[in-house]
Every structure is written in structure tokens, then in C-alpha cells.
């Protein structure tokens, strides 16, 4: 879901019957205190939905043009394993990024924490918003 973070609780509650039993990606950031994600509301209102947290740690520029010098950037996400995971990973790949699962939905705070260094570099260090991260392995 991509609605303003401040509208998430109301949107989830109003549409809970339609959302339940679906695969949902929580993409919105609720700025201004409290958790960035809306996972608690999703879990309370849509107990049969498969909830993921992704697409929340980069600026939109990285989704519109995911082209980088050293190949695709990694998009950190979390959520349940299973068939819905492959759908989420296919979507991330289709956008042009490499899916990097950090675990089940209990890792949402870890996914959310990626936003902090992104903001520090994009704004604080004035590197611009079109930047992303990549996990390097031997």
C-alpha cells in the first residue's frame, strides 16, 4: 500500500474486509514519532493477510530509475516465507532492484532502520536522493 503514512490506520480499518487474505506490502512511512510502519494495525485488522514491509527505505527516484554504476541495488524487505514471498520478490526484481529478505515480519524495525542512513546520505551529506545500498559478498 502506498498512501500517506498518516492515513494508513484509517485506510486499513475502512478496507479491512477487502485486504484480509491478500498479500500486502506496507510501503508507507508514518513520520513524526512511533513506529514508521503500520504492521500492528494490519495484524489486528487483517489477521489472514500476508504482510510484508518493503519499498519504504529509498526515495521514489530509485524506483523510477533503478540504474546504478555497479548493477542493481538491494531492496531490504521482510515478511513471511512461502508462495507470497516469491510474488513480492518478483515485484522487487521487476522494479529493477535485488530483493534482500531480512527475515519474517518481526524484522520490520530492521528494514525501517535502513531509512536513517539513506536520509543521512541523501540530505545530510547532500548526495542526492538517487542513491541506494548493496550487500557485497565474496
Where do the protein language model's features map onto the residues?
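Short beta->alpha connector loops
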Residues: 4-8, 57-59, 81-82
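Short glycine-rich or small-residue beta-strand-to-loop segments that form or flank ligand, phosphate
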Residues: 24-26, 74-77
Amino acid at each position: 500500500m502506498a498512501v500517506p503514512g498518516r492515513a494508513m490506520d484509517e485506510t486499513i480499518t475502512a478496507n479491512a474486509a477487502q485486504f484480509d487474505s491478500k498479500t500486502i506490502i506496507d510501503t508507507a512511512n508514518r513520520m513524526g514519532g512511533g513506529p514508521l510502519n503500520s504492521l500492528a494495525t494490519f495484524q489486528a485488522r487483517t489477521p489472514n493477510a500476508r504482510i510484508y514491509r518493503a519499498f519504504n527505505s529509498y526515495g521514489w527516484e530509485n524506483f523510477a530509475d533503478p540504474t546504478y554504476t555497479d548493477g542493481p541495488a538491494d531492496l531490504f524487505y521482510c515478511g513471511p516465507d512461502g508462495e507470497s514471498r516469491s510474488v513480492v520478490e518478483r515485484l522487487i526484481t521487476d522494479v529493477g532492484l535485488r530483493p534482500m529478505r531480512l527475515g519474517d515480519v518481526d524484522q520490520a524495525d530492521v528494514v525501517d532502520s535502513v531509512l536513517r542512513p539513506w536520509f543521512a546520505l541523501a540530505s545530510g551529506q547532500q548526495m542526492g536522493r538517487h542513491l541506494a545500498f548493496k550487500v557485497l559478498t565474496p
